[in-house]
Amino acid sequence: MCSFLNVGKKVTVWRVSWPVILLLTITACVSTSAAALCPQSSVDPSVTICTPKDGAIVPSPTHVVAGTNDSHTVKLLQIYLDGVKVYEIAASSLDTTVSMSAGKHRLTVQAKDSISQIFKQTIYVTATAGGLSNLKHIIFFVQENRSQDNYFGRMGKYRRDRGFNDSFDELPLNGSFPDKAGHLVSPYHFKTVCHENLTPSWNASHYDVHGGKMDRFMLSALASTIDPDGTRAMGYYDWTDLPYYYELAFQFGTSDRFFSSVLAPTIPNRMYLFAATSFGHIRPDKPPEGGWPQPTIFDKLDNAGVSWKYYYQDNSIYLAEWSTWQRDSGKVVKIANWYTDINNEDTLPKVIFIERATATGLDEHPLNNIQTGSANTKKILDALMNSISWDSSAFVLTFDEGGGLYDHVPPATVPKPDSIAPMLRSDDLAGDFNETGFRIPLIVVSPWSKPNFVSHRVRELTSILRLIEVRFNVPNLTDRDGMADDMTEFFDFSTPHWVTPPPLPDQPTTGTCDFNLEKAPGH
């Protein structure tokens, strides 16, 4: 499978938003090997659908590969399902996935070339029941302010040491950049499990990117008497600090192309997490009386009759800033209920959000102890793995944004959620909502997870919403989640690989937490 918008050429993607007759999800990606894998007809012009075959019985989602033969330049490829256009790409071949309801469907791939010739191929497929229906519960838990390189920059070595010599875009240890004093600093292993804050603000984040050079994280770091040169931006952790997370990600599914939604701090990203847009906001702006009125994923679930619950751990309840809270506060309950609810699968809601524990310092945010935070995550997930609900659940663990910590991969291009421009002030750096934020850690945990899996497809936080929408037939919120990958690549529904969860290590909480140890060696 190819990576979305990650194959060295730009593509234009269009997809259907709600309403549509069928539940359809397209992963917009172009494979550089699609044509080679798909022998073309000698007819000029023609479209050849190589996968699936005509008359095939297919799972949902199903893999679709098609190519063209044309003496003129093919400008556009489109997919129609039962006469409804669901996908469009400016390319001469495609390699993507389509989710559909159970039953027989007419699938057409249509091309248009430079002289406006239109030609196509149509096949019939039958989608089987099952697939995503094996997931009766989707749980998402989003911690705070960690970049991919800060937590999982050494995951490639961890995998190689266990016999997996696959590609994993890991932290380049030999890179170096100037700090505020002009000294070159390379990534270094933190000697402390806590450190001072940096800044993931709109301006700092856009400054850090520097046209894709990714070399200004230290320069934008918040002032500190301990680390005045900002070197802590280059610090990282590994399996000796976070053995539970490393093994969890190794055994189940992870990604080296999962991003936050916007180059901005926590609140705009959590707006995307709930509403698939920040409706122009780039700062932690105060909501109006009664909360933000824009619809959230929870409102969409209500309208679709899909049960949900929101578990909070201390007095941190971000949903209280939304009008959804006024209508649905009864669905927001203390985390103690989680440990009993999961042992009654019949009444466990279909969608669950677990709030991070900010007030008690267990959210893994800079300033806080990463080991006590990750140990708390283990407690929550252990309970699920040992419950009756494990067999039918998927648990998605990620972080809201990178926190100003170094990551070497530039943000990716994504669709704008809507027509609302960023609310820029006169001194703000230019930017828009057509790119992601920085990479963040992701682990997808389920008995249906592909074992030892690494995804290289570009996704961001709204892909979690898309997974929920696709699974429970819920309309999308904006164009951003409507065009997001649905994360089904992480699962193998032919068999549950982890009926019994794999053995996982304890997460120690005895590491040294001392801000005085946060600086780079030699500083």
How does the language model describe each region?
Residues M1-V13:
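N-terminal secretory signal peptides that target proteins for export/translocation
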Residues S17-A28:
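Bacterial N-terminal signal peptides
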Residues V30-T32:
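Bacterial signal peptide processing site
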Residues A34-A36:
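Boundary at the C-terminal end of the N-terminal hydrophobic targeting segment
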Residues A129-H523:
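N-terminal pro-sequences and low-complexity stem/linker regions of secreted or lumenal proteins
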